[in-house]
């Protein structure tokens, strides 16, 4: 899996508290190993966000992304609280 990082993801990641940054990095390690792990709650988004997917990091924290070629390439679009990231 090749990870790409959108500017919005990088900007949002920088604003996270240290504990949440660690949780995001741990989740991404797990995601790279097994993108469909049930614990990640990997799911397609609907409505205005159709074509995008999201995984759960911890509690309210989500990562929104797109994937191509069966997860060969993943672009991380945003990270943050549920209500904020679903307003892309």
Residue locations for each model-derived region?
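Enriched for short, Lys/Arg-rich terminal
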Residues: 2, 7-11, 15, 22, ...
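Generic leucine side-chain signal with a strong bias for well-ordered alpha-helical environments
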Residues: 16, 28, 45, 76-77
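A generic secondary-structure boundary signal that marks alpha-helix termini
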Residues: 17-18, 33
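A short, surface-exposed loop/turn module that caps and links secondary-structure elements
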Residues: 30-55
């Amino acid at each position: 899996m090749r990870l790409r990082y959108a500017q919005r993801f990088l900007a949002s990641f920088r604003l996270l508290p240290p504990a949440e940054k660690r949780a995001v990095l741990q989740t991404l390690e797990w995601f790279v190993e097994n993108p469909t792990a049930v614990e990640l709650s990997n799911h397609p988004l609907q409505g205005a966000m159709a074509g995008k997917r999201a995984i759960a990091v911890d509690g309210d924290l989500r990562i929104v992304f797109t994937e191509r070629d069966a997860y060969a390439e993943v672009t991380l679009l945003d990270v943050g609280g549920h209500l904020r990231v679903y307003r892309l």
